[in-house]
């Protein structure tokens, strides 16, 4: 088995999908896991990007089906901007499409800035822009878990195969969640699900960005990765890609294994 084939298997990627079937499977997963845990619903941060839009709509459909079947469940969508988000219009468009039971907005700037200032006072240096970006992601995680813990809700994560293969998420930030309904999907497959669900094109054709950096606001994921999502998707779907691209992907995959595992102990062998 080649490393490419091993990665596809490990990340549960299918070369070809049927969007309707995938939507059904993922809604059922959300419903089944919610019932198994006894939680009261879901909470998810909505950015206005493809991934949270898709996960949010699946979550809302899941809780609506549970209620129609005589159960009780709710979904809270959370806006988590740092000050004013330049693409707030996209976030509002996403919320209109998702139609969540409840929507709230938390400005994470006061918490992030207070921590950053205290860090500088105590340690005599400023956080790098990169590390401050990770603080933003982790404050967003803390906010979602505060809501979830208070109201008995599960935190949904938006990780998918193209992020998982590169480790392109913040450990214990956007990587911190209770369940991952987009697991196994490539970026283009996620777009196909949104198309099937009737999303506005603007939401799934939007340039993907983590938007965590103050010095490079709105920087494209592809710029930071040095790999395009089309290349990642081709690789993950078992297609041939240029050798240098395959090497970049595989290097990132191997280097980010710790992000896909629970914290290492001396009894584990995955890190050896």
From Swiss-Prot:
Binding-site residues for ATP, renumbered to this chain: 45-52, 158, 187, 209
Key words of the record: ATP-binding, Ligase, Magnesium, Metal-binding, NAD, Nucleotide-binding
Catalytic activity: deamido-NAD(+) + NH4(+) + ATP = AMP + diphosphate + NAD(+) + H(+)
CDD domains in the cross-refs: NAD_synthase (cd00553)
EC code(s) of this entry: 6.3.1.5
Function: Catalyzes the ATP-dependent amidation of deamido-NAD to form NAD. Uses ammonia as a nitrogen source.
UniProt pathway: Cofactor biosynthesis; NAD(+) biosynthesis; NAD(+) from deamido-NAD(+) (ammonia route): step 1/1
GO molecular function: ATP binding; glutaminase activity; metal ion binding; NAD+ synthase (glutamine-hydrolyzing) activity; NAD+ synthase activity
Lineage, highest ranks first: Bacteria, Bacillati, Bacillota, Bacilli, Bacillales
NCBIfam families per record: nadE (TIGR00552), PRK00768.1 (NF001979)
Pfam families in the record: NAD_synthase
Binding annotation for Mg(2+): 51, 163
Database matches in PANTHER family: NH 3 /GLUTAMINE-DEPENDENT NAD + SYNTHETASE, NH(3)-DEPENDENT NAD(+) SYNTHETASE
Protein name, entry field: NH(3)-dependent NAD(+) synthetase
């Amino acid at each position: 088995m080649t490393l490419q084939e091993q990665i596809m298997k490990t990340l549960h990627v299918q070369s070809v999908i049927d969007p309707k079937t995938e939507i059904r499977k993922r809604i059922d997963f959300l419903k089944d896991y919610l019932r198994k845990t006894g939680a009261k619903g879901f909470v998810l941060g909505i950015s206005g990007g493809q991934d949270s839009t898709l996960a949010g709509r699946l979550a809302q459909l899941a809780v609506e089906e549970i209620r129609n079947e005589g159960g009780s469940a709710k979904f809270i969508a959370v806006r988590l901007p740092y000050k004013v988000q330049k693409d707030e219009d996209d976030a509002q468009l996403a919320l209109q499409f998702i139609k969540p039971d409840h929507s709230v907005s938390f400005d994470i700037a006061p918490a992030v800035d207070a921590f950053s200032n205290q860090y500088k006072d105590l340690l005599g240096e400023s956080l790098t822009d990169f590390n401050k970006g990770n603080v933003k992601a982790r404050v967003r995680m803390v906010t979602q878990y505060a809501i979830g813990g208070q109201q008995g809700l599960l935190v949904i994560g938006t990780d998918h195969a193209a992020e998982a293969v590169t480790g392109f998420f913040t450990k214990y930030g956007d990587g911190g969640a209770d369940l991952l309904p987009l697991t196994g999907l490539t970026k283009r497959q996620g777009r196909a699900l949104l198309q099937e669900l009737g999303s506005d094109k603007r939401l799934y054709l939007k340039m993907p960005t983590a938007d965590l950096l103050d010095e490079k606001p709105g920087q494209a994921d592809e710029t930071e990765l040095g790999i395009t999502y089309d290349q990642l998707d081709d690789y993950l779907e078992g297609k041939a890609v240029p050798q240098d691209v395959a090497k970049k992907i595989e290097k990132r995959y191997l280097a980010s294994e710790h992000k896909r595992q629970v914290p290492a102990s001396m009894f584990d062998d995955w890190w050896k």
